[in-house]
């Protein structure tokens, strides 16, 4: 009898601890309707193989052609087609940037999603698959050129943007595609037309889509301590052809123009998805992923919405498309909001700063946070050729990178760049780390308390 009672007690405690330690099971709503995600080209092939899906897809495309959302939803045949497609792989399909049939994939995506929202959304969902890589992956790939272990004084005085151009020239693919876009974007057509902008944009897209990020990022996001370096960074995309124009259009007009093209629309939506400032994360970036934001920014270069640095200020990071909000009328607030997603975006600013510093969220040391003050503006100077050294003329007293601050042990002031520098260094989180279930937290604590309260009663019962 005693052995039987002891066995019951042991079984009770074992089951109680198992229930506390095991993670909760997925909710039924999460399991319902789950299906593996495929790219839209493959999803279209799967749909075409099914007569019901194929016919409904054709119907929906006819419904979306030339009709607004309310008219489409009022049609029962259109509603039925939409309901069928919502259960097909087409509805959840996504695309990969730079994939072989990217344009076809995006056309399929927008053929379904373009007319399903009421009016024009400010932020559209990205048609691209989520980015899972991190900046630390880029750093590992670029370590051969990073100068790790070099003399700190030499590193502080070097022009990182010049070093990036030299590194590109050591790679055949990077050198070839860079030379191509430089040649095309610098080719004057006539006295009134300084270049063929369409061809320049195409050459830039090929460069940023086909050259690995460890080269392109170093040229776009190199850290600078002087004006010459910052001007070289600004000149990376040959802005006189690819970026600037005679007049600045209204930003909302530029956005509307961009959204008439499936590729431009997709890259803009992806930028908003990955760089939209989030105040629920430590870095101000969605999912604390700097790499996703920088990739989305680079992905817009070579389109109507091409962004660039607005000046050659080495201490301030301000980027913008070539537009303003003049003539916005009653849409001025929306226009300013759109423009500030570039000019005053803490996620984008922190991501660029982090890359220049060689830091990522899961490899950043902890540090204090400083209030920001406006950095002084510096006049532009002409860019320099790759073989000409334009090392810093400001000396080591002007330090804008986190690593330089830590290495030299200087006292921090309240400058804007230091605020940005330390903002992203306030965490040691690894986003990829697994969850740890704490036995004495939350509901587990309450459940354990209940179990322990019931234990004496059970022992009395078993002893009888």
From Swiss-Prot:
Matching InterPro entries: GDNF/GAS1, GDNF_alpha, GDNF_rcpt, GDNF_rcpt_a2, Glial_neurotroph_fac_rcpt_a1/2
Disulphide-bonded residues: 40-93, 47-53, 63-78, 95-105, 161-222, 168-174, 185-200, 195-241, 224-229, 251-323, 258-264, 275-293, 285-347, 325-335
Region (Disordered): 363-392
Membrane topology: Lipid-anchor; GPI-anchor
Assembly and oligomerization: Interacts with NRTN ligand and RET: forms a 2:2:2 ternary complex composed of NRTN ligand, GFRA2 and RET receptor. Also forms a 4:4:4 tetrameric complex composed of 4 copies of NRTN ligand, GFRA2 and RET receptor, which prevents endocytosis of RET. Interacts with SORL1.
SUPFAM superfamilies tied to this protein: GDNF receptor-like (SSF110035)
Gene transcribed to yield this protein: Gfra2
Low complexity: bias regions: 381-392
Function: Receptor for neurturin (NRTN), a growth factor that supports the survival of sympathetic neurons. NRTN-binding leads to autophosphorylation and activation of the RET receptor. Also able to mediate GDNF signaling through the RET tyrosine kinase receptor.
Tissue-level expression: Neurons of the superior cervical and dorsal root ganglia, and adult brain and testis. Low level in the substantia nigra, spleen and adrenal gland. Isoform 1, isoform 2 and isoform 3 are all expressed in brain, liver, ileum, spleen, heart and kidney. In brain, isoform 1 is most abundant, isoform 2 slightly less and isoform 3 is lowest. No significant levels of isoform 1, isoform 2 or isoform 3 expression in testis.
Positions annotated with a glycan in the UniProt record: 52, 357, 413
Record protein name field: GDNF family receptor alpha-2
Lipidation (GPI-anchor amidated serine): 443
Any one biological process term the GO annotation gives: nervous system development
Pfam families: GDNF
Signal sequence residues: 1-21
Residue ranges of the propeptide: 444-464
Subcellular location: Cell membrane
The family this protein is said to belong to: Belongs to the GDNFR family.
Keyword set, alphabetical order: Cell membrane, Disulfide bond, Glycoprotein, GPI-anchor, Lipoprotein, Membrane, Receptor, Signal
Cellular component terms per the entry's GO annotation: plasma membrane; side of membrane
GO MF: glial cell-derived neurotrophic factor receptor activity; heparan sulfate binding
